[in-house]
């Protein structure tokens, strides 16, 4: 048997890039595997997460490097004991996670004047102006509140400042002035990101060309460009109670819709490779334009890997791709692990990857999914053929994806936000098709601003529907306060449910 223990990444590639020969044997082998069996990178990703969560107890990297060297040597010498090799590789990734774990915050002391660069659009508050500042040359990023006046209201991304910060976030009226050369300390990528924020401001002006409902404009800005500054507290509560907050936060849902649109617009099969290159470049350009949120980076990375598989004519293991994406993102920015958006994005995708094969009648390794049984019953197709059949099947697909994603994220949502939306199925059945229409319409509005009125009218309909859902009886269960242990136990119960469902649905022989 081939052993990929020492080279997990290349082993993963070999496992997912089978030779074109003996396809029947490959299919027979795949039928016996669960999604977890097809993800050899999953244990390594979990080990990396564990190392980052533990952190570096020594304060310096040298002791950990010595430990990593010893573990690597033992792993290389343990060729006759695969279990020892596997444990060695896992421990190496734990140590790697400890090495890349974010250090404790230090940074610039209070009251010290330092150069800074405005790294976000300003957001007005009753008495202050909120903005993210990049403190140079240390590179520390802080969310600061400046005294609101005519000067602070004119700030924009990429402006050079000299500031004196108190209590780590407050800047007085006389505590800042324009000047310095902070941009020179930034990398080319950071300067490009600041330039992208200016482009986003231009795009926002195009979207706001129509003097329509302010709430509708705020929703379009959040959905299309990730700008939530104009969202009122009441509007946020409506989306939260109805279970549609994920629509306001740019995520894999939005990027998948854009991917679908670009796929329809690209060239034919004889130019397939060029179409995939253009699609991937466009996805990353959009991700950069909207601020490189963790959920979008996750989705863009996964779609890029999928495009590479498509160009090679190979199959992919979604859970393996998700694990690879987590490893890459955490190695570049280990602090992302503690970001709520990162956790929700990966857990939602994990729920979809694990549970959707149980619902889908075309999934390998299953006799017939729940999706098949619901739509066909005991050998009878209750859904008529044709366009009406397509509407029903797509509607059921939206519901099943919502359930799968909710199974992955509900415990975390209850832990962080203390709320569970009970009408999320009804919400997603209407909101997901409307979100698709709104994103398509936003592209048209960027080219033809005169069409903004029609787009904002559709958004107004969506807002009205969500407002209706938020007023339904028992629209949400509030004041939930689960502990970390309770969240872990809930996920254990979900894992048991998954195992039982997998056995219930059955495998092909």
Q: Where are these predicted regions, by residue range?
A:
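Internal transmembrane alpha-helical bundles of multi-pass membrane proteins
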Residues: 292-495, 499-505
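Aromatic-rich juxtamembrane segments at the membrane interface
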Residues: 32-38, 46, 170, 174-308, ...
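Hydrophobic, membrane-inserted alpha-helices
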Residues: 45-53, 68-74, 256-263, 279-287, ...
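Membrane-helix interface "capping/anchor" motifs
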Residues: 38, 77-86, 267-275, 310-321, ...
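Short nucleic-acid-contacting surface segments enriched for D/E, G, S/T with interspersed K/R
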Residues: 149-163
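Structural detector for short beta-strands of small beta-barrel domains
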Residues: 109-124
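Short aromatic-glycine-enriched beta-strand elements
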Residues: 123-132
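N-terminal leader/targeting segments
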Residues: 4-107, 171-173, 177-179, 298
